[in-house]
């Protein structure tokens, strides 16, 4: 039938476009690095302290300091559009963070957090990528097919960037890699963009906390994450 043939042609056209877009030689030449937005999400903030310990070390503060350092490193690397979901110690709702991401449609979202354990022994870093649910739309609908293919591409991009960051952080946290796994990211609900969540050390561990709280060490962490991003996108 004419309509069936039209759908087949449309689907094949979409598949070719996605394949060409995903080829390294084409996708990385345009747009230029400086034109690609990156959003850095400093977890918690304001009245939301995040993890806290007895000496009044708050996760929200460590997240923000690292986010600012990472923004600076990426700007130095040629990324002109590096946006923060918060640039100060203030309350920013998940809805507000999501709206920024939705409007920006960035090449990548990096969400920064610090971990905590029941004792001071747990240490190291772990990374997560969001799982993108495929739709239940008509499988003959070209729009539904391209939607799922885009989600799969974003998933692959997320995992690739996470693996590069993971490798770079190994130099800062030797033998403290706690793995890479899938986890939901509420601020990406209904938004499909590449994203990586980084739990960057345990603030309940003295050595990890010192690295996060020390300016020089924090700069080294930011540089490692920036290198991973450059290699991954």
What residue ranges belong to the model's regions?
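Short, well-ordered alpha-helical segments in soluble proteins
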Residues: 150-153, 169-173
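Active-site-adjacent mobile loop/cap segments within catalytic or ligand-binding domains
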Residues: 104, 111, 115-119, 170-233
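Generic non-transmembrane alpha-helical segments
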Residues: 69, 73, 77, 160, ...
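Catalytic-core regions of hydrolytic enzymes
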Residues: 26-140, 147-161
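Bacterial N-terminal signal peptides that target proteins for export
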Residues: 2-12
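Conserved hydrophobic/aromatic pocket- or pore-lining residues that grip, position, or stack substrates
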Residues: 40, 63, 165, 198, ...
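Bacterial N-terminal signal peptides
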Residues: 10-21
């Amino acid at each position: 039938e004419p309509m069936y043939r039209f759908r087949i042609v449309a689907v094949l056209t979409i598949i070719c476009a996605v394949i060409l877009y995903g080829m390294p030689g084409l996708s990385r030449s345009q747009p230029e690095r400086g034109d690609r937005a990156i959003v850095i999400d400093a977890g918690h903030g304001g009245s939301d302290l995040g993890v806290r310990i007895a000496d009044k070390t708050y996760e929200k503060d460590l997240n923000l300091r690292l986010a600012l350092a990472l923004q600076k490193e990426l700007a130095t690397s040629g990324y002109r559009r590096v946006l923060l979901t918060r640039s100060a110690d203030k309350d920013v709702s998940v809805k507000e963070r999501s709206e920024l991401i939705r409007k920006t449609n960035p090449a990548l979202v990096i969400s920064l957090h610090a971990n905590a354990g029941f004792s001071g022994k747990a240490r190291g870093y772990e990374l997560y990528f969001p799982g993108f649910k495929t739709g239940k739309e008509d499988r003959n609908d070209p729009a539904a097919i391209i939607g799922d293919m885009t989600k799969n591409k974003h998933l692959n991009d997320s995992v690739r960037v996470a693996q590069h960051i993971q490798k770079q952080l190994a130099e800062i946290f030797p033998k403290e890699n706690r793995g890479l796994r899938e986890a939901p990211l509420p601020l990406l609900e209904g938004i499909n963009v590449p994203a990586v969540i980084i739990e960057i050390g345990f603030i309940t561990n003295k050595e990890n906390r010192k690295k996060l709280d020390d300016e020089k060490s924090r700069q080294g962490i930011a540089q490692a994450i920036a290198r991973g991003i450059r290699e991954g996108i």
